[in-house]
Swiss-Prot record:
<dbReference type="GO" id="GO:0005829">
    <property type="term" value="C:cytosol"/>
</dbReference>
<dbReference type="InterPro" id="IPR008925">
    <property type="entry name" value="aa_tRNA-synth_I_cd-bd_sf"/>
</dbReference>
<feature type="short sequence motif" description="'KMSKS' region">
    <location>
        <begin position="239"/>
        <end position="243"/>
    </location>
</feature>
<keyword id="KW-0963">Cytoplasm</keyword>
<dbReference type="GO" id="GO:0008270">
    <property type="term" value="F:zinc ion binding"/>
</dbReference>
<dbReference type="GO" id="GO:0005524">
    <property type="term" value="F:ATP binding"/>
</dbReference>
<dbReference type="InterPro" id="IPR020751">
    <property type="entry name" value="aa-tRNA-synth_I_codon-bd_sub2"/>
</dbReference>
<keyword id="KW-0067">ATP-binding</keyword>
<dbReference type="GO" id="GO:0004818">
    <property type="term" value="F:glutamate-tRNA ligase activity"/>
</dbReference>
<comment type="subunit">
    <text>Monomer.</text>
</comment>
<keyword id="KW-0648">Protein biosynthesis</keyword>
<dbReference type="InterPro" id="IPR045462">
    <property type="entry name" value="aa-tRNA-synth_I_cd-bd"/>
</dbReference>
<dbReference type="InterPro" id="IPR014729">
    <property type="entry name" value="Rossmann-like_a/b/a_fold"/>
</dbReference>
<feature type="short sequence motif" description="'HIGH' region">
    <location>
        <begin position="10"/>
        <end position="20"/>
    </location>
</feature>
<dbReference type="GO" id="GO:0006424">
    <property type="term" value="P:glutamyl-tRNA aminoacylation"/>
</dbReference>
<dbReference type="InterPro" id="IPR004527">
    <property type="entry name" value="Glu-tRNA-ligase_bac/mito"/>
</dbReference>
<comment type="similarity">
    <text>Belongs to the class-I aminoacyl-tRNA synthetase family. Glutamate--tRNA ligase type 1 subfamily.</text>
</comment>
Length: 469
C-alpha cells in the first residue's frame, strides 16, 4: 500500500473553526492509523485577509488539541514562484492561455446571463488567440484551457462517483493580473509537491473538486483519493453559525473544555465505532477508518459535549483538578496557599457538580475567603427576604460550638430548626445564600467544616450590614 500522506490546509483569516478542527483531526487520525504522514499547510495567498494572529491561533489550537503535524509548516505565500513556473509550463504545452478580458466585461456578461436566466460560464475570446493579437496596455491573467468535450468524474469515498460535464466548468484563472497564484492552482501544485495521497475535507469543497481535477489532469498528476464530509450543523439543523454558540477552538478552551474531551466529541461528530462514546486519542488512532464516516450532517449538541467533558474531568486526579481550577481563578484573583488547600479539600464535592473547568472555578470561588463575596441574583433575593432574627440566632448558636465539624454543625442546625418549628431546608436556604452567594451548592456542612468557624461567621454577619442589592 502507498504511504498515506494527508494534510490540513487552513486559510489564516480568523480563529481555528470548530469544523476545521474536526477536519484536521480526521486527517491526523487517518495518517496515524496508517503509519503515514500528516502535514500542515497555511493557505495565505490572500494577503489582505491573512493575519499573523490567525496563524498563531491555528498553531496554538492544534497543539492544544494534541494534533501534531510532521515536518515544517508550508506557507503558500512563500511559494508563488513555483506556482508561476507551473502555470507557464501549462502555457507552453497549450493547456493554458493569456486572457486580457477586463473584469467589467465579465461582470456585464454575468449580469446579462442572470437577466436571461441562463447559467453563466465565461468563454474568453482569447482562448485560441496568439501573441500577435495581445494588447500591450493590459496585464493579462492566465486561465486554464478546460477541454470543451467530455466530463470529469469525482471518485469520492463517501459521496460516491459524481460526474460533471466539462461544459459546466469554466476556464478558471490560475495566475492573477498582479502575478499571484489563485487558490485553485496553488492547492494542486502544493498537494502534488507534498505527495498528498488522501484529501479529507468538508463537502463545501465538493463544488471545487471537479475544477481542481481538471487542473490535475492538465498537469498529468495523479488525483488524490477524495473524501468530502458533511459539515457540522447547529441544533436546529442549519449550517453552523455564531448564533449556535462558540465557533473557535480557543473559545471552547476558555469555556473550560478539556482538549481530550473536545477531540472525543469532534470525532463522534460524523464518525462512529459501534456504540462507543468515550474514545481516547490512542483508541481513535487504532480504530479510525473512512468506512465509518457518516453521510448525514452532525448537529452540535452542548449537552452531549458537557457529558463527555464531565467524564474526562472525573478521570483527572485531585491535584490536577485543583491546579487547573486555581489557574483559572488566578486570572482574576489573588489566591493564598490556604485557599488552595480549601479548594483541594473540597474538590470531590465540586467535581460531581461540574461539567467544565469554568463550572469548577465558579464553585471553587466559595473557598476564596480573602476575596469579596459575589452573590447571584437568586441569592440576593433570598437574603433580602430572609428572617434576619433567625440568622442572628444561627450566628449565636454557631459561635458557641466548640467542635466545628460537619456532623456537629448539621446537628446544631437541626436543633435550631426544631426550636423554631421549621424544616431544616427552610433555614438552610438563606444560610446557603449568605455563605456561598448561590442558592445551589455543595453541602453547606462540608463547606463550613472546610472554611472553619471564623470564615463562616464572617459571611453570616453580612446580615448586619446595609446590603445594597
Amino acid at each position: 500500500m502507498t504511504n498515506i500522506i494527508t494534510r490540513f490546509a487552513p486559510s489564516p483569516t480568523g480563529f481555528l473553526h470548530i469544523g476545521s478542527a474536526r477536519t484536521a483531526l480526521f486527517n491526523y487520525l487517518f495518517a496515524r492509523h496508517n503509519n503515514g504522514k500528516f502535514f500542515l499547510r497555511i493557505e495565505d495567498t490572500d494577503k489582505k485577509r491573512s493575519t499573523k494572529e490567525a496563524i498563531a491561533a491555528i498553531f496554538s489550537g492544534l497543539k492544544w488539541l494534541g494534533i501534531n503535524w510532521d515536518g515544517e509548516v508550508i506557507f503558500q505565500s512563500k511559494r508563488n514562484s513555483l506556482y508561476k513556473e507551473a502555470a507557464l509550463k501549462l502555457l507552453k504545452e497549450g493547456k493554458a492561455y493569456y486572457c486580457f478580458t477586463k473584469q467589467e466585461e465579465i461582470a456585464r456578461q454575468r449580469q446579462q446571463a442572470l437577466k436571461d436566466k441562463k447559467h453563466f460560464i465565461f468563454n474568453s475570446e482569447w482562448r485560441d488567440k496568439g501573441p500577435s493579437t495581445y494588447p500591450a496596455d493590459i496585464k493579462p491573467v492566465i486561465r486554464l484551457k478546460v477541454p470543451r468535450e467530455g466530463s470529469i468524474t469525482i471518485h469520492d469515498t463517501l459521496q460516491g462517483d459524481i460526474v460533471i460535464e466539462n461544459s459546466h466548468i469554466d476556464d478558471m484563472i490560475l495566475i492573477r493580473a498582479d502575478g499571484t497564484a489563485t487558490y485553485m492552482l496553488a492547492v494542486i501544485v502544493d498537494d502534488h509537491d507534498m505527495g498528498i495521497t488522501h484529501i479529507i475535507r468538508g463537502d463545501d469543497h465538493l463544488t471545487n473538486a471537479a475544477r481542481q481535477i481538471a487542473i490535475y489532469h492538465a498537469f498529468g498528476y495523479e488525483v488524490p483519493n477524495m473524501t468530502h464530509i458533511p459539515l457540522i450543523h447547529g441544533a436546529d439543523g442549519t449550517k453552523l453559525s455564531k448564533r449556535h454558540g462558540a465557533l473557535g477552538v480557543e473559545a471552547y478552551k476558555d469555556m473550560g473544555y478539556l482538549p481530550e474531551s473536545l477531540c472525543n466529541y469532534l470525532l463522534r461528530l460524523g464518525w462512529s465505532h459501534g456504540d462507543d462514546e468515550i474514545i481516547s486519542m490512542n483508541q481513535a488512532i487504532e480504530w479510525f477508518n473512512l468506512d465509518s464516516l457518516g453521510k448525514s450532517p452532525s448537529k452540535l449538541d452542548f449537552a452531549k459535549m458537557n457529558s463527555i467533558n464531565s467524564h474526562y474531568l472525573r478521570m483527572l486526579d485531585n491535584d490536577s483538578l485543583t491546579s487547573k481550577t486555581v489557574a483559572i481563578l488566578k486570572q482574576n484573583y489573588k489566591i493564598s496557599e490556604k485557599e488552595v488547600s480549601y479548594i483541594k479539600q473540597a474538590m470531590p464535592s465540586l467535581i460531581v457538580r461540574s461539567a467544565t473547568l469554568i463550572d469548577l472555578a465558579q464553585l471553587a470561588y466559595i473557598y476564596l475567603v480573602d476575596s469579596p463575596m459575589i452573590y447571584n441574583q437568586d441569592a440576593k433575593e433570598v437574603i433580602k427576604n430572609c428572617d434576619k432574627d433567625l440568622i442572628k440566632q444561627i450566628i449565636a448558636n454557631l459561635n458557641k460550638l466548640e467542635q466545628f465539624d460537619k456532623e456537629c454543625i448539621q446537628n446544631k442546625f437541626k436543633e435550631i430548626a426544631i426550636y423554631n418549628g421549621l424544616k431544616l431546608n427552610d433555614i438552610m436556604r438563606p444560610v446557603r445564600a449568605l455563605i456561598t452567594g448561590m442558592t445551589a451548592s455543595p453541602s453547606i456542612f462540608e463547606i463550613a467544616e472546610t472554611l472553619g468557624k471564623e470564615n463562616i461567621l464572617k459571611r453570616l454577619n453580612i446580615i448586619y450590614y446595609n446590603l445594597n442589592f
